[in-house]
């Protein structure tokens, strides 16, 4: 088996996000619909035999030992008892604080890559359980299938939904998830709904009004994109998106936007590009 491996860490969208209530432990009960994008970071792994975990790519403002990639690798080491280590390089394309899963996706890719490189043989459920300790969004990336999520986001039901094209705008802000969920004006009493209701268009993102109020850059991006297509916040933002039936229409709207506004066009996918790549490995 090769001691080197390169794998993608795909972005995700929350196609809706309803907050049903607040639990006694401070976490929020929610419902959301995850779909992956064929766009993301790329990670490169090389196994080492001395047990050291080294991430060679610095992320501004994130200490090495606090990075979810490093925490995922060390967590898997500890839980599995593996004596192997790894060198990791990251090609970072996804924004931090964007609501498209950058850090969680990187952590999930790390767990799956090292399960393969270190020949641990862990099954999907065991990896997802470890991922949940790193963050509520990590299990959806380790499982790799579009899903209707409930609880704090950890109860996942795979779904088969239309794979549309998306134009995603990336306002230059770093949104604090904790700040949004602690806002006193956040809606916390939305009724539970079914996936069919979401696909019929009767849904929203409960975090969007709070994020718009706190982050003018996000509000402006929504106003701009709404001129061309129904726009929505993903997660707690700050990325916003609109859907299109094909790439040509998404590209057409993208070309009409100001040059200074960062954005990308990507296809939605019910099976993540990470898992499609893993299926090709022997």
Swiss-Prot record:
Residue positions of the active site: 12, 137
Sequence positions that bind ATP: 95-105
Catalytic activity: 4-CDP-2-C-methyl-D-erythritol + ATP = 4-CDP-2-C-methyl-D-erythritol 2-phosphate + ADP + H(+)
Keywords noted in UniProt: ATP-binding, Isoprene biosynthesis, Kinase, Nucleotide-binding, Transferase
GO biological process, one term: terpenoid biosynthetic process
One Pfam family from the record: GHMP_kinases_C
UniProt-listed Enzyme Commission number(s): 2.7.1.148
Family, as annotated: Belongs to the GHMP kinase family. IspE subfamily.
Role according to the record: Catalyzes the phosphorylation of the position 2 hydroxy group of 4-diphosphocytidyl-2C-methyl-D-erythritol.
Protein name: 4-diphosphocytidyl-2-C-methyl-D-erythritol kinase
Organism, as annotated: Pseudomonas aeruginosa (strain UCBPP-PA14)
């Amino acid at each position: 088996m090769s001691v080197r491996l390169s794998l993608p860490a795909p972005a995700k969208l929350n196609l809706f996000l309803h907050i049903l209530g607040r639990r006694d432990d401070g976490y929020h009960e929610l419902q959301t619909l995850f779909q992956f994008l064929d766009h993301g970071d790329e990670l490169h792994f090389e196994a080492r035999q001395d047990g050291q975990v080294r991430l060679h790519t610095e992320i501004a403002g994130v200490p090495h030992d606090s990075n979810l990639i490093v925490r995922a690798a060390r967590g898997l080491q500890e839980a599995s008892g593996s004596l192997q280590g790894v060198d990791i390089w990251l090609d970072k394309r996804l924004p931090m604080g964007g609501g498209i899963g950058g850090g969680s996706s990187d952590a999930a890719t790390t767990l799956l890559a090292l399960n393969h490189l270190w020949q641990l043989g862990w099954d999907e459920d065991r990896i997802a359980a470890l991922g949940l300790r790193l963050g509520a969004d990590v299990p959806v990336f380790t499982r790799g299938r579009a899903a209707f999520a409930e609880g704090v986001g950890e109860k996942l039901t795979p779904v088969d939904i239309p794979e549309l094209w998306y134009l995603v705008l990336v306002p230059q802000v770093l949104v604090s998830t904790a700040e949004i969920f602690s806002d006193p004006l956040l809606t916390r009493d939305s009724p539970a709904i079914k996936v069919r209701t979401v696909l019929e268009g009767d849904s929203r993102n409960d975090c969007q009004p709070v994020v718009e109020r706190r982050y003018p850059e996000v509000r402006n991006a929504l106003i701009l994109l709404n001129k061309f297509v129904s726009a929505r916040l993903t997660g707690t933002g700050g990325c916003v998106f609109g859907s299109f039936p094909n790439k040509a229409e998404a590209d057409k709207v993208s070309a009409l936007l100001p040059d200074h506004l960062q954005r990308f066009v990507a296809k939605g996918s019910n099976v993540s590009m990470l898992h499609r790549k893993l299926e090709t490995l022997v």
